[in-house]
Amino acid sequence: MKVRPSVKKMCDNCKIIKRRGVIRVICATPKHKQRQG
């Protein structure tokens, strides 16, 4: 899980979702998981 000021899609499988006011990226590739913080 990477914590970044700006989250971006890293590949076509990445999905940007908002969970409890936190923007997250979920993906089949565990390396691509991110959240904004």
Curated annotation (Swiss-Prot):
PROSITE patterns: RIBOSOMAL_L36 (PS00828)
Keywords in alphabetical order: Ribonucleoprotein, Ribosomal protein
GO BP annotation list: translation
Gene Ontology terms, MF aspect: structural constituent of ribosome
GO CC terms: cytoplasm; ribonucleoprotein complex; ribosome
Alphabetized Pfam families for the sequence: Ribosomal_L36 (PF00444)
Keyword Transport: no
Keyword Ribosomal protein included in the entry's annotation: yes
Entry similarity comment: Belongs to the bacterial ribosomal protein bL36 family.
Listed name of the protein: Large ribosomal subunit protein bL36
